[in-house]
Swiss-Prot record:
<dbReference type="Pfam" id="PF04791">
    <property type="entry name" value="LMBR1"/>
</dbReference>
<keyword id="KW-0175">Coiled coil</keyword>
<feature type="topological domain" description="Extracellular">
    <location>
        <begin position="54"/>
        <end position="105"/>
    </location>
</feature>
<keyword id="KW-0225">Disease variant</keyword>
<feature type="topological domain" description="Cytoplasmic">
    <location>
        <begin position="454"/>
        <end position="473"/>
    </location>
</feature>
<feature type="transmembrane region" description="Helical">
    <location>
        <begin position="433"/>
        <end position="453"/>
    </location>
</feature>
<feature type="topological domain" description="Cytoplasmic">
    <location>
        <begin position="543"/>
        <end position="695"/>
    </location>
</feature>
<feature type="glycosylation site" description="N-linked (GlcNAc...) asparagine">
    <location>
        <position position="78"/>
    </location>
</feature>
<keyword id="KW-1003">Cell membrane</keyword>
<keyword id="KW-0597">Phosphoprotein</keyword>
<keyword id="KW-0812">Transmembrane</keyword>
<dbReference type="GO" id="GO:0071875">
    <property type="term" value="P:adrenergic receptor signaling pathway"/>
</dbReference>
<keyword id="KW-0991">Intellectual disability</keyword>
<feature type="coiled-coil region">
    <location>
        <begin position="227"/>
        <end position="262"/>
    </location>
</feature>
<dbReference type="InterPro" id="IPR006876">
    <property type="entry name" value="LMBR1-like_membr_prot"/>
</dbReference>
<feature type="coiled-coil region">
    <location>
        <begin position="571"/>
        <end position="603"/>
    </location>
</feature>
<feature type="topological domain" description="Extracellular">
    <location>
        <begin position="409"/>
        <end position="432"/>
    </location>
</feature>
Length: 695
């Protein structure tokens, strides 16, 4: 099994990163370089999380071998060396090789490749690709130029920070500047920035994740929160449609002014390709190909303005598409949660859906997840399961907070992570060591990464599932992962006292900490910032528990879901009404489709039989008629059939209620024939101003 576990985890982590990227990204529409860059960043970060437990178990085995080699057989105590505590005699307690043992020399090379590749991605390549993807240039040269200009300040800041550390080391008379020390300074600067952000995200996730499961077990909580999301998403959806309309109006004007032989026509064609298909069909070229442009009597947009318009179109189309998909997903969630609320009082213990799933389910899932099992899970088991899971996660959070505040204490050892690992180290239970390390670092990663997936920065950074994340957000997430994962793992090794700078023992370090270098070059960071700054997680957890951040966002006008707030109640009621209208609309559509299906099944076959009999009894002499008469007869029958079909459609038209008004407007803004595209009419009442009328 030597090295086999490492190879299996490398393959498994690759497919895990590929699966998550497929869920959030769009392989068909997004650029290949964006997909490859994001996949590589996620893959390297996940590798660090999954491979680090193997490094810990291998290091413990190497420490045992080193202690056994330095111990004399007749004596029962070890020489002052790797272990400060007494070790048993090797003949009585031999060092067992772990099942996942990695041969010497592999892990240092592996960590160097993974770490420095991830650092190159996060500090150099991904920021450049981010600016390149957001650029509205029409050529590769133009996009590269824009990306370099945008990143000039970005890279200048890094050079300034690195220069400050460099001056500190150069001025200090007790330090001699060498290449290893320069490397350590760079690693310390990157880890310091990452640890600063890590504690902020960790303090939020340690409280919010257990609380989300506890609140999810409450009856009606998820449904109320879904109503709240529906009201906010409708406002965002209307805003996205208005922005798209404004962008398409500008494109229409540019398309009409710049003719086929204008030098900038290729730029306009590039912009048109980025527009939705329905807008392209509506506008077309919208010009006369035989009409030349006149430079003297017309005012044409510049290339710089077209670049700005191109960037605006890309952003507007992506945001509009994302809100449309999210709205449909939110509707399905709301309908399902309403079904759960209705089925809770069911006496038959059979889960009944209001609407059938549009996608056919797997037969295997249908067999086991039948209506009876679904009722017991959704109405009885799931709330209890969520409560138990919330309690377990809360215990993990308390352990993390306690260990973050006490991991610097070595005598006695107060960090619970260090206590558990040292107990397993005495018996060389490598399976337990790897499982404990993996669960601990996995929980820390979930708390940090889930916060990264949840945060949203003014629509510029937003990870949306169902392939709705844009290139800018994907690359930004890759940058965050590469910056957060190394300090996260270094912090975990400090919690378990596997880092010699924390345990203050002359023991063999892990291969991961060996590539970080000695932090004694920057003692104020190693002995100060790395130890005392993580204690701030206590303050952040308290602030998150009392929802101080949520209340501040509410005061600033960014509405958040709070049960004791009047604005939240108004938005919940508004969202409930929106869901009710959409539900009634879908019910009418399904009823209309059912009536059409019944009409075809009842009268479709009779009409085909009568037509077939009429053709059989037709006079054979009619076949000698001229082609003109044949065409005329066919035209008459076509008109008759069309008239009958129109009558049938009119009979099948759904009768709308008397109070029906908003649903008569169409979702497609292209049906307006005016020169200016009309904004979505039914969303005007849902504008952002209506939300704050009662304030």
């Amino acid at each position: 099994m030597s090295g086999a576990a490492l190879g299996l985890e490398i393959v498994f982590v690759f497919f895990l990163a590929l699966f998550l990227l497929h869920r959030y990204g769009d392989f068909k529409k997004q650029h290949r370089l964006v997909i490859i860059g994001t996949l590589l960043a996620w893959y390297l970060c996940f590798l660090i999380v999954f491979i680090l437990p193997l490094d810990v178990s291998t290091t413990i085995y190497n420490r045992c071998k080193h202690a056994a080699a330095n111990s004399s057989p007749p004596e029962n105590s070890n020489i002052t060396g790797l272990y400060a505590t007494a070790n048993p005699v090797p003949s009585q307690h031999p060092c067992f090789k772990p099942w996942s043992y990695i041969p010497d020399g592999i892990m240092p090379i592996f960590w160097r490749v993974v770490y420095w590749t991830s650092q190159f991605l996060t500090w150099i390549l991904l920021p450049f690709m981010q600016s390149y993807a957001r650029s509205g240039g029409f050529s590769i040269t133009g996009k590269i130029k824009t990306a370099l200009i945008e990143n000039a300040i970005y890279y200048g800041t890094y050079l300034l920070i690195f220069g400050a550390f460099l001056i500190y080391v150069a001025v200090n008379p007790h330090l001699h500047l060498e290449w290893n020390q320069l490397q350590t300074i760079g690693i310390a600067a990157a880890n310091t920035w990452g640890l600063f952000l890590l504690v902020l995200l960790l303090g939020y996730g340690l409280v919010e994740i257990p609380r989300s499961y506890w609140n999810g077990a409450k009856r009606g909580y998820l449904l109320m929160k879904t109503y709240f999301k529906a009201a906010k998403l409708m406002t965002e959806k209307a805003d996205a449609e208005e922005n798209l309309e404004d962008a398409m109006e500008e494109v229409r004007k540019v398309n009409e002014s710049i003719k086929y032989n204008h030098p900038l026509r290729k730029c306009v064609d590039t912009i048109l390709k980025k527009c939705p298909t329905e807008y392209q069909e509506k506008m077309g070229r919208n010009m006369d190909d035989y009409e030349d442009f006149d430079e003297k009597h017309s005012i044409y947009p510049s290339e710089k303005s077209l670049v700005k318009l191109h960037k605006q179109v890309i952003y507007s189309v992506q945001r509009h598409r994302r809100t449309q998909v999210q709205w449909q997903i939110l509707l399905e969630q709301a309908f399902y949660l309403e079904d759960v609320a209705k089925n809770e009082t069911s006496a038959t213990h059979q889960f009944v859906h209001t609407f059938q799933s549009p996608e056919p389910e797997n037969r295997f899932i249908q067999y086991f997840y039948n209506p009876t099992f679904e009722w017991y899970w959704e109405c009885l088991l799931r709330p209890w399961f969520y409560k138990i899971l919330a309690v377990v996660l809360s215990i993990f959070s308390v352990i993390v907070v306690w260990s973050e505040c006490t991991f610097f204490s070595t005598t006695p050892v107060l960090s619970l992570f260090a206590v558990f690992i040292q107990l397993a180290e005495k018996t060389y239970n490598y399976i337990y060591i790897e499982i404990a390390c993996f669960l601990s670092i996995f929980f820390l990663s979930i708390c940090v990464y889930s916060t990264v997936f949840r945060i949203r920065v003014f629509n510029y950074y937003y990870l949306a599932s169902h392939h709705q994340t844009d290139a800018y957000s994907l690359l930004f997430s890759g940058m965050l992962f590469c910056r957060l994962t190394p300090p996260l793992c270094l912090n975990f090794l400090g919690l378990t006292h596997m880092d010699s700078s924390i345990s203050h023992k002359n023991t063999q370090p892990t291969a991961y900490t060996s590539i970080m270098g000695s932090m004694k070059v920057l003692s104020f960071i190693a002995d100060g910032f790395y130890i005392y700054y993580p204690m701030l997680v206590v303050i952040l957890c308290i602030a998150t528990y009392f929802s101080l951040g949520t209340r501040c966002l509410n005061l600033l006008g960014f509405q958040q879901f709070m049960g004791d707030d009047d604005m939240t109640s108004d938005l919940v009621n508004e969202g409930k009404e929106l869901i009710r209208k959409e539900k009634r609309k879908r019910q009418r559509q399904e009823e209309g489709e059912n009536r059409r299906r019944e009409w075809k099944e009842r009268y479709g076959h009779n009409r085909e039989d009568s037509t077939r009999n009429r053709n059989i009894h037709t006079d054979p002499k009619e076949s000698n008629f001229s082609d003109v008469n044949t065409n005329r007869s066919a035209f008459k029958y076509t008109r008759a059939n069309n008239r009958t079909e129109r009558d049938r459609i009119e009979l099948l038209q759904d009768a709308e209620p008397l109070d029906f008004n908003a649903e008569t407007f169409t979702d497609d803004p292209l049906e307006s024939e005016s020169g200016r595209y009309q904004p979505g009419g039914r969303y005007l009442s849902m504008s952002r101003s209506d939300i704050f009328n009662d304030v």
